Amino acid sequence: MTIHWSGTGLSAIPGLRELIQTGKPVTVWNRTVEKAQDAVGDLTQDIKRFEPAMIEAALQPGDVIVSMLPGDWHVPLAKMALTKGAHFVSSSYISPEMRALDTQAKAAGLALVNEVGLDPGIDHLMAHYL
Protein backbone atom coordinates (compact mmCIF):
# COMPACT_ATOMS: atom_id res chain seq x y z
CA MET A 1 0.00 0.00 0.00
CA THR A 2 1.43 3.32 -1.12
CA ILE A 3 0.11 6.72 -0.14
CA HIS A 4 0.12 9.07 -3.13
CA TRP A 5 0.21 12.60 -1.65
CA SER A 6 -0.66 15.30 -4.19
CA GLY A 7 0.20 18.90 -3.36
CA THR A 8 2.82 20.47 -1.12
CA GLY A 9 1.29 23.85 -0.36
CA LEU A 10 1.68 25.49 3.05
CA SER A 11 -1.27 23.66 4.63
CA ALA A 12 -0.01 20.30 3.38
CA ILE A 13 3.60 20.31 4.54
CA PRO A 14 3.28 19.59 8.30
CA GLY A 15 0.99 16.58 7.80
CA LEU A 16 3.06 15.29 4.91
CA ARG A 17 6.28 15.52 6.90
CA GLU A 18 4.68 13.63 9.82
CA LEU A 19 3.38 10.93 7.48
CA ILE A 20 6.75 10.41 5.78
CA GLN A 21 8.45 10.15 9.18
CA THR A 22 6.20 7.21 10.13
CA GLY A 23 8.05 5.15 7.54
CA LYS A 24 4.97 4.29 5.50
CA PRO A 25 5.52 4.28 1.72
CA VAL A 26 4.66 7.76 0.43
CA THR A 27 5.04 9.09 -3.10
CA VAL A 28 4.85 12.88 -3.27
CA TRP A 29 3.30 14.38 -6.41
CA ASN A 30 3.53 18.12 -7.01
CA ARG A 31 3.18 20.44 -9.98
CA THR A 32 6.59 21.90 -9.12
CA VAL A 33 9.10 19.20 -8.14
CA GLU A 34 11.53 21.78 -6.76
CA LYS A 35 8.91 23.12 -4.34
CA ALA A 36 8.21 19.59 -3.08
CA GLN A 37 11.94 18.95 -2.69
CA ASP A 38 12.26 22.12 -0.62
CA ALA A 39 9.36 20.97 1.58
CA VAL A 40 10.24 17.30 2.15
CA GLY A 41 13.39 16.50 0.18
CA ASP A 42 15.30 16.02 3.42
CA LEU A 43 12.94 13.13 4.25
CA THR A 44 12.28 11.41 0.90
CA GLN A 45 13.49 11.27 -2.66
CA ASP A 46 10.21 9.74 -3.88
CA ILE A 47 9.01 13.03 -5.37
CA LYS A 48 7.43 13.21 -8.81
CA ARG A 49 5.87 15.84 -11.04
CA PHE A 50 2.08 15.88 -10.73
CA GLU A 51 0.82 14.24 -13.91
CA PRO A 52 -2.54 12.44 -13.65
CA ALA A 53 -1.51 9.78 -16.18
CA MET A 54 1.62 9.01 -14.16
CA ILE A 55 -0.37 8.75 -10.93
CA GLU A 56 -2.87 6.44 -12.62
CA ALA A 57 -0.05 4.23 -13.90
CA ALA A 58 1.49 4.02 -10.42
CA LEU A 59 -1.77 3.45 -8.52
CA GLN A 60 -2.40 -0.08 -7.24
CA PRO A 61 -5.45 -1.61 -5.53
CA GLY A 62 -5.42 -0.68 -1.84
CA ASP A 63 -3.33 2.45 -2.34
CA VAL A 64 -4.49 5.83 -1.06
CA ILE A 65 -4.59 9.16 -2.90
CA VAL A 66 -4.39 12.20 -0.63
CA SER A 67 -5.31 15.39 -2.47
CA MET A 68 -4.12 18.67 -1.04
CA LEU A 69 -4.65 20.29 -4.42
CA PRO A 70 -7.29 22.88 -5.34
CA GLY A 71 -10.83 21.50 -5.16
CA ASP A 72 -11.28 21.09 -8.89
CA TRP A 73 -8.85 18.15 -8.78
CA HIS A 74 -10.65 16.16 -6.06
CA VAL A 75 -13.39 14.53 -8.13
CA PRO A 76 -11.10 13.51 -11.02
CA LEU A 77 -8.62 12.00 -8.56
CA ALA A 78 -11.41 10.26 -6.62
CA LYS A 79 -12.75 8.77 -9.86
CA MET A 80 -9.24 7.60 -10.71
CA ALA A 81 -8.95 5.98 -7.29
CA LEU A 82 -12.25 4.16 -7.76
CA THR A 83 -11.27 2.77 -11.16
CA LYS A 84 -7.98 1.49 -9.73
CA GLY A 85 -9.40 0.06 -6.48
CA ALA A 86 -7.77 2.71 -4.31
CA HIS A 87 -9.00 4.97 -1.51
CA PHE A 88 -9.20 8.78 -1.60
CA VAL A 89 -8.75 11.49 1.05
CA SER A 90 -9.07 15.27 0.80
CA SER A 91 -9.29 18.18 3.19
CA SER A 92 -12.11 19.86 1.27
CA TYR A 93 -15.84 19.98 1.65
CA ILE A 94 -17.94 17.32 -0.10
CA SER A 95 -19.21 18.60 -3.44
CA PRO A 96 -22.36 17.19 -5.06
CA GLU A 97 -20.10 15.51 -7.66
CA MET A 98 -18.09 13.84 -4.89
CA ARG A 99 -21.25 12.77 -3.07
CA ALA A 100 -22.42 11.11 -6.30
CA LEU A 101 -19.44 8.71 -6.07
CA ASP A 102 -20.45 7.43 -2.62
CA THR A 103 -22.57 4.46 -3.77
CA GLN A 104 -19.88 3.26 -6.17
CA ALA A 105 -17.20 3.54 -3.48
CA LYS A 106 -19.27 1.66 -0.90
CA ALA A 107 -20.09 -1.10 -3.40
CA ALA A 108 -16.36 -1.50 -4.09
CA GLY A 109 -15.44 -1.45 -0.39
CA LEU A 110 -13.44 1.75 -0.86
CA ALA A 111 -13.27 4.87 1.28
CA LEU A 112 -13.71 8.41 -0.02
CA VAL A 113 -12.84 10.54 3.00
CA ASN A 114 -13.41 14.29 2.77
CA GLU A 115 -13.72 17.27 5.11
CA VAL A 116 -10.68 16.37 7.21
CA GLY A 117 -9.14 19.84 6.86
CA LEU A 118 -9.01 22.69 9.35
CA ASP A 119 -11.92 24.73 7.97
CA PRO A 120 -14.37 21.83 7.73
CA GLY A 121 -13.24 20.69 11.18
CA ILE A 122 -13.93 24.08 12.73
CA ASP A 123 -17.32 24.19 11.02
CA HIS A 124 -18.24 20.75 12.36
CA LEU A 125 -17.16 21.66 15.89
CA MET A 126 -19.06 24.95 15.80
CA ALA A 127 -22.19 23.23 14.48
CA HIS A 128 -21.96 20.72 17.32
CA TYR A 129 -21.43 23.51 19.85
CA LEU A 130 -24.42 25.52 18.59
Walk through the language-model features, giving the residues of each:
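NAD(P)-binding Rossmann-fold cofactor-contacting core
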Residues: 26-40
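Rossmann-like NAD(P)H-binding beta-loop-alpha module
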Residues: 117-130
